């Protein structure tokens, strides 16, 4: 009987520690989702502002080219539709989100558009991407109970954006900026979707449908 009473405080402490870790993990999820939502909105605004500087014919032509082209980050394997996203594990969605954010750390520094607001935004974006990458890595560690973490050996190395755009013609700067902004907007929407679904699945929220 005495041993039972001695074990009770230990069990209570373990229970409280477990609850504390779960609450901290949920807090990190909320922060990550809020940050990527902000990045997505910022990417949408930058893209819309840039489109507003183009002539209608130029905008239509660039949109046609972009629909036939692909983004540098498309080499990262990710769900192809809503159904596949819903079926993916929380850990898989976190890993893909990490890769997508990581793929934009360097390109985000090259959004040098001749607009002071956009240049300030590009600097702000680089910082937010780095913070979000750290946050997602913490979520991955929490989901794996700290057994594994993402390191350099586990990274998918993407081709540099400089090579990706080196064959563009005389209007390369305009097309390059258009595609960078369009791809950034697309990828931030992906990460927002994946983190939202992962959070919903992790904490069994009422409606996880897309």
UniProtKB/Swiss-Prot annotation:
Repeat as UniProt keyword: no
Organism from which the protein derives: Oncorhynchus mykiss (Rainbow trout)
Protein name from the UniProt record: Somatotropin-2
Signal peptide start-end: 1-22
Any single Pfam family the record assigns to this protein: Hormone_1
Family: Belongs to the somatotropin/prolactin family.
Principal subcellular localisation of the protein: secreted
Subcellular localization: Secreted
Lineage start: Eukaryota, Metazoa, Chordata, Craniata, Vertebrata
The UniProt record lists the keyword Metal-binding: yes
UniProt gene name: gh2
Positions annotated to bind Zn(2+): 38, 192
Molecular function terms, GO-annotated: growth hormone activity; growth hormone receptor binding; metal ion binding
Keywords (A to Z) from UniProt: Disulfide bond, Hormone, Metal-binding, Secreted, Signal, Zinc
Domain of life: Eukaryota
Disulfide bonds: 71-183, 200-208
Role: Growth hormone plays an important role in growth control and is involved in the regulation of several anabolic processes. Implicated as an osmoregulatory substance important for seawater adaptation.
Annotated InterPro entries: 4_helix_cytokine-like_core (IPR009079), Somatotropin (IPR034975), Somatotropin/Prolactin (IPR001400), Somatotropin_CS (IPR018116)
Regions annotated as coiled coil: none
